[in-house]
Amino acid sequence: MNLENKNSFFLNSALFFSTMGSTATTLGFITYIFNTTHSPFNTGAVTIATLLVGMLLGPFLGILVKEKGLMWSMVVPEIVSGFILLIFVFIDNLYLVYIIAFLIGFNNKILGIARLSFIPNITNDLVKFNALLRSINRFALISGSLLFSVIINYSLTMVFVIDAIILFQPTYFID
């Protein structure tokens, strides 16, 4: 497995930052809902909104990724998610959180399918590369939780703004 491959570096970097930001945003949504409603039911509902995408649309999203192409599927959903988060920052609405969580879950599902489909273009050693991706993913989940913990001390809105900025980062990796 050649980790010096430029595409490997870009994919792994994008995965790390995207997952880190998404983790912080998910925790931000949960915190926002609980602080606004003080309802455990509503807090759980925002998590369900992100998971529904995989259940309802997962089987069909692979077709969308194939039709649109891998590069489109790895860049456009991140940028769209960034704009969606910025809209939420300016339009502070409780019910909008559920729609945004669903849309971001939709974009993340497309992105996940595209990333996994792109791996054979980078390496023939799929087992090692998948293990590397899982390790990066877990490290990003921990880093995202830490990022959230630090930023929440200043502002919940800042969590969403920082993730929106992070979501625009795939444009820097386009060749």
Model-inferred region functions:
Residues I79-N93:
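C-terminal ends and interior cores of transmembrane alpha-helices
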Residues S39-T47, N130:
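Juxtamembrane helix-start elements in MFS-like secondary transporters
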Residues I30-N35, S143-D163:
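Transmembrane alpha-helix termini and helix-breaking/packing motifs in multi-pass membrane transporters
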Residues A24-F41:
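Short amphipathic helix-loop junctions that connect adjacent transmembrane helices
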Residues F10-T26, T50-G62, M74-S81, L96-I152, ...:
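Substrate-agnostic recognition of the 12-TM MFS/MFS-like secondary transporter fold
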Residues T25, F34, I84-F88, I104, ...:
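MFS-fold secondary transporters
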Residues M158-D175:
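Symmetry-related core transmembrane helices of the 12-TM Major Facilitator Superfamily/SLC fold
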Residues T37, G69, I91-D92:
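Helix-breaking motifs and short loop linkers at transmembrane-helix boundaries and internal kinks
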